[in-house]
Amino acid sequence: MLIRGEIMKLLRNISQVFLCCSIASFANAETVKIAIGHQSMCTDTYTAGIVVKELKLLEKYLPTEGKYKDIDFEVSWSDYSSGGPITNQMMANKLNFGVMGDYPLIVNGAKFQATDSLRTKYIAGTGYNLKGSGNAIVVPVASDIYGIDQLKGKDVSVPVGSAAWGMLLKAMQDNNISSSEYGLKNQSPAVGAANIAAGKIDAHGDFCPWSEIMEFRGTGRKIFDGSETNVPYLHGVVVREDFLDEYPEVAVAFVQAVYEAGDWIREDPVRAVDLMEKWTGVEKEVLYIYFSKGGHLTLDPTIKSEWVDALKLNHGVLVTEKSIPPLDFNEWITEDYLKAAYKGLGKDYDAEKSIMNDPAVSNKGLPMEIWHSREGISTYSSMSKFLSAVSEFRATGAKLNSTYVYDKETGLKLFGKTAFFVSTDDGFSTFLRKPDADAFASKTAGMVMDLEGALEVSEKLMKVSSL
């Protein structure tokens, strides 16, 4: 009995030692909260937002060595309808990272620099369109408005503080339309799109992919594309400086996750848009117009000197139109985390930074596409083959998810059903805007029509050629 008692006492002592060690280990473990604000209804944020979130790419790259050995990371994502609320939450120290468009980025940096001690850093991009496509102004599909000059005396809504808001201000400035000559309404993307569908607003300006959502659903029609401003359309990542100072390796990990997200989309755009539709609710056919080969967005985290120039120009637009604090771009923008991330991935940052994609050049000669509901996407090297295929599919009663053509002026990928077709002796050309189509038709003695008209002309030509 004595021996048994001694053994029990020894076991109790050992248990107490292990318990104390476990408590001490738990007490030494630090939990670092990583709070990210993103926008699941803004396509140009996806490589730093929904894709990173759903594929858990940040967790893949988070540091685990050195001072991070005993750290537990708690990653949280908050979804917002535009960039402005993200900045507000960052200022309240409820978010460390923010993903937003060019004008909201500028407001973010300027607001933080206007404080005594708080700062953010612009550490990476997500994607771009060189000429500015992504933002657009849309009217109800039955509207008789076809140009921005027709917006004088009209009511125009936009999410104030968004990238589209900045685009709208710039577009009005460029067309000599003063703020007193139109009514500006602050409406969220969802409200603006609903009002366009109901014909309750004359026009609505919004960021990607809302104009294409309205086009795809048959409720809206573009009258102005952001590419007409000829200013790059950008999104990027800002981080609170106090977080960066304490956990710089986390920012590097975030950039590496952004890079992999871009690779994942490029590897298989159809797979990507199918999953992103499930994650966001945005139709895959709409997402395809952004993320496919020849799509509106070039996924690229690098910060090019041209982007800095564009952001400075955008800041000037806001200074002219609205009261906005100064912004020291040299203090705000840093490539340090990008360079460290690229080095860790074995990539050449300077080489990728030097690459610039212009859709007007790179999209020349790309094939037209038909997305069949069962057979997937087929490509066509000529407009005649494309139109014939559409007619043949329809004759079988097949459901076509979407068709895609390219704007002759900008190289932008368009929905076939919303493009303006011009029929000439040399065949068909397609345009985003009716004024461009009218001008081309005037030069070439052509006729402007929609897809249905083009199909009729194509069928007549085929019958004649078969005689």
Regions found by a protein language model. Give the residues of each.
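Bacterial N-terminal signal peptides that target proteins for export
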Residues: 3-17
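Pocket-lining segment of extracytoplasmic ligand-binding domains
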Residues: 113, 181-185, 189-278, 384, ...
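Conserved C-terminal helix/tail region of periplasmic/extracytoplasmic solute-binding proteins
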Residues: 318-356
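A bilobed periplasmic-binding-protein/Venus flytrap-type ligand-binding module shared by bacterial periplasmic
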Residues: 52, 134-145, 233-249, 422-424
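Sec/Tat signal peptide C-region and signal peptidase I cleavage site
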Residues: 6-7, 25-29
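Short, glycine-/small- and polar/acidic-enriched structural segments
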Residues: 30-178, 183-185, 202, 231
